[in-house]
Amino acid sequence: MQVIRQRRISEKQQVNLFGRHVGRRALLVTTGIAVALGVTGTAVASTYQFGTQQVGQTTANGQVISSDQYIKPYGSRTVINDGKIMSSTVSPDGTRLAASVTDGDASLVVMDLTTGQIKQKIGTSTADDLRISSGAVGQEGPTYSPDGKQLWLGQADGYTKFTVNADGTLASPTAVPIAADGAKQALVGAAVFSADGSTVYSAVNGQNKVVAIDAATGTIKQSWAVGTAPRGIALVGGTLYVSNEGGRPAKAGDTTINSYGTDVPANPKTGASTTGTVSVIDTADPSAAVGTIAVGLHPTAVYAKKGAVFVTNTADNSVSVIDTRKGKVVQTIATQPWPEASVGYEPNAVTLTDDGRLLVTLGRANAVAVYRYSSPQQPARYVGLLPTDYFPSEITTVGKKVVVSNTRGVDALRPDAAGHNTHDTTSSLTRFTLPSDLGVRVQTAKVFKQNGWTPGSVKTAASKSHAKAVPVPARLGDPSTIKHVFLLVKENRTYDQVFGDIPQGDGNSSLTQFGANVTPNQHALAQQFGLYDNFYDIGTNSAEGHNWLMQSDNPEYTESSAGEYTRSYDTENDVLGHQKSGFIWTGAQAAGKSVKDFGEFQSLETKPAGATWQNLYCDSKNMAATGAETAYPIKTGSAIPSLNDVSVQGFPLFDLDVPDIYKEQIWQQDFEKSGPANLNMFWFSNDHTGGPANAAAEVADNDLAVGRMVDKITHSKYWKDSAIFVVEDDSQAGLDHVDGHRAPVQVISPYANHSTVDDHYYSQITMVRTIEQILGIHPMNQLDSAATPMYGAFTKKADTTPFTAVPNRTSLTLGVSPQPSCGSDTPAPQDTKAAAAPTTVSVPAAEKALAAQWKTWASHQRLTGPNAVPDYANPTQMNRYTWYQTHNWTKPYPGDSKIYAPDDVPGAYLPSPESDG
């Protein structure tokens, strides 16, 4: 346990690639916005307040985090450097806090609440104080027995039961398994003990049931069928109240989308679930039918006190209050503090103080909402907000102190001597005594400031707007000079990995793996259209990253599933991973715009026989030379009907057995035949690495595909009114000297500022808001509603000079075995002024045995084939494998003293937080 010292970063001077200074244009940009406001009367969102600040920097407003927010919590803070807290509980005597954690060096930690020190770490590492067999942890728990002598930790296949020593540490881990139901593991949710401690009632999330377990023997005594994905649970007398995140079972005639083998009632357009329920179980009468109470969407936490059961409706942004005497909802409390947006606050925990103050954590707003509450029938009165750390997820009281567990703590700032990575995750506890109502209101203003919530952030044009067209209009629906937006999604790279070798930017070349001789097109695009060296991806991994791009949010369901990712990983085909406000494509359609999707957010793929990497590589060359259609038509699809309707067949999704230049040819044929839509989305994924070719070759393939695509667009009749955004889904697969979330982005348009270095803070959220503003798409939630569009990246004066793709300098067939029948790829000469890229796959004799071990390891990581899963591999291992390949097995990974075997990598004991099971 330690408190992280915040990095203090001085503002640097930004240098134009051609000598123009734009780094100090914060005043200019602000002035431009003010002029726009003076003309239109439209207020603007407030993420421009970041200026050129960097993530991790401490400012007067708080610490900058990667989600367009500041954090500066009320009360005291204790940072936990052992990963993200998934759930936590306080011991009955109030002296200890037990927290399940993930993405770090433990699965469970026990903290002394008096000293703030970690007393014990439990996990799968040899360095942990107590070893257990599995590191996977569930969404809810752990749970103490009423006498404090036992603690039960929820895991994928049941529980691990511990005895509690006199000093609060744990001992004697014992498995309490719950058998799988076919392919469905238990995936236990919350648990609660009977008053006498003899029975544990468990919400078996993966099997849609609740079970009663004998606490002494682990035997299941009784089982009740409930709704879909039971999660929270509370015991009031002899009655259980269980939240079903997926709602009621589907009925005949329902439109449904699957979640972990269960069909869930769903909206076919938004892909979101449409019901939420609480199951009511009489534990004293085994024959009694299970009752059902309808609540809001995605009911998660359940808390009972003073004749009421409180249920957080995470997707509906409300709290249902159930009167236990009446057995029904008697009031619904709104948790939508900012009038500009009704979605995206994500209430996820609740408690009631003895003096009648209801406290609700708002995970995505980094705040606790405070209400005055007296009884179930008397409407609660909103008081205000208290700031927390990043993504609060649990709240309780210990004496007069409020204790808040924050899943993401202070963001990815775990100490790392080699550089920063998104998996350097932290969590934190914040503790405070509740201030007076006046004090809460004072803190409310700080929460608004930290979130950028300002009045008038979302304004729409009048029905008959006569505004002059500009690239990024100030009001939604006003005309834009840009009619066609292309969103190209790539995989996993940090800024330093790709652009660290560009001296004009804020880079560190020692961390650059894919410099100018691997990514000549991205470097040329940066030279022509501008370099952005202060842009951030928000997610830790692909499960989160694609959500941020498509929903401008990573829903709480995915956030809280990171301890095991067994229900789903990428939630494209999981109804519970979708917000009720829909996606960027549904917003475009609602605005009357056309959409085409090429692989992005899709989840289904069928390939014909013979569709190997080698054959598809040769096929792409034939298509380019002759214009012939592919010889290997690939079928793709989505579980979301609205995405299926706009998907272009034949364009593969994530599949490292498919070259990206093949994908580019599939797109090019459609482009030539039918032209672009208003919104065009793509998934070019081979810079993920791990496929048949050497890592450098895969990134070169990705680079060439992007370069050719931009070449084609910029030489077409559509170029004059187009904008292309090239972005990574996340930046987890490498290191960055500023922050692990810093990533490359490219803004390509006649209206983009050309040949500049822009060091203003931007993020995936501000990029999404820019696209929304261009196409007139209403923002999806409070995050993109608060975001300032990337006004500073655009200019009113068009420069229609096209881009000409640069030949690849790294062989695309490097490392492929056998080589394609059409011959090996011969690259262009490398730039001798840039760092050399691999030209052969050579392994020093001393490392051949290690390289063979890595090859075997890679074959088990689901990187290719019909069951390929993005980021299935453990990230600490995958990042080293890629590094070793790009350095010909001659150089240790940054911060390491040697080249490791897969099982010896520090962190290799971790279950992959990206594994889908």
Label each PLM-derived region with a short phrase.
Residues 425, 440-917:
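N-terminal pro-sequences and low-complexity stem/linker regions of secreted or lumenal proteins
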Residues 45-470:
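Predominantly soluble domains enriched in secretory-pathway, periplasmic, or organellar proteins
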Residues 1-22:
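N-terminal secretory signal peptides that target proteins for export/translocation
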Residues 35-37, 429, 771:
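Residue-level signal for nonpolar/aromatic packing positions in well-ordered secondary structure
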Residues 8, 13, 33-35, 44, ...:
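Intrinsically disordered and other compositionally biased segments
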Residues 39, 166, 326, 376-379, ...:
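Short, structurally constrained coil/turn elements
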